[in-house]
């Protein structure tokens, strides 16, 4: 069985683009959520989540990331135009900045699912390191 993902994004065209990219890369998207309640309901049991910071119910992305990671062992990658709003990144692997490329999303999905990102995505995903410092993914 393939890896499963949830997309937490309130802009439907962005969410559908993420879904298209993930599906083409072989992942199964279990749903799209635009708010905290929906994300926590359908996110349980997923392998990883792509989460925006600012959603329909406010800047709840970091709270959702914390809940899904801590309570359900879901790997989290933020997809945001506002990475400076990620105050507490302890529960996330890193982030992809909007606007994103297909290669950035594919690389982030590979990392979140325990794989290796493609070499052409070397600088597309920012990983969180110790003490909140970020570093780019380096190609092999």
Regions from the PLM with identified roles:
Residues 51-69:
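Conserved phosphotransfer microenvironments
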Residues 115-140:
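CheY-like receiver
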Residues 12-31:
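Two-component/phosphorelay signaling modules centered on CheY-like receiver
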Residues 32-48, 56:
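Acidic, metal-coordinating helix/loop segments flanking the phosphotransfer/catalytic sites
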Residues 79-80:
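Hydrophobic/aromatic residues positioned on beta-strands within the core alpha/beta folds
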Residues 98:
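A Lys-centered signature of the CheY-like receiver
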Residues 101-107:
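Conserved two-component signaling phosphotransfer/partner-docking surface
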């Amino acid at each position: 069985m393939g890896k499963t993902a949830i997309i937490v994004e309130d802009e439907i065209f962005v969410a559908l683009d993420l879904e298209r990219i993930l599906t083409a890369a072989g992942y199964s998207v279990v749903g799209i959520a635009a708010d905290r309640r929906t994300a926590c309901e359908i996110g349980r049991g997923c392998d990883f989540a792509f989460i925006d910071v600012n959603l329909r119910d406010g800047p709840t992305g970091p709270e959702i990331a914390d809940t899904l990671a801590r309570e359900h062992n879901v790997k989290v990658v933020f997809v945001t135009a506002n990475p400076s709003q990620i105050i507490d990144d302890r529960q996330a692997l890193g982030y992809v900045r909007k606007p994103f490329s297909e290669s950035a999303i594919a690389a982030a999905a590979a990392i979140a699912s325990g794989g290796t990102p493609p070499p052409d995505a070397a600088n597309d995903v920012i990983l969180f390191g110790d003490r909140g410092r970020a570093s780019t993914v380096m190609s092999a």
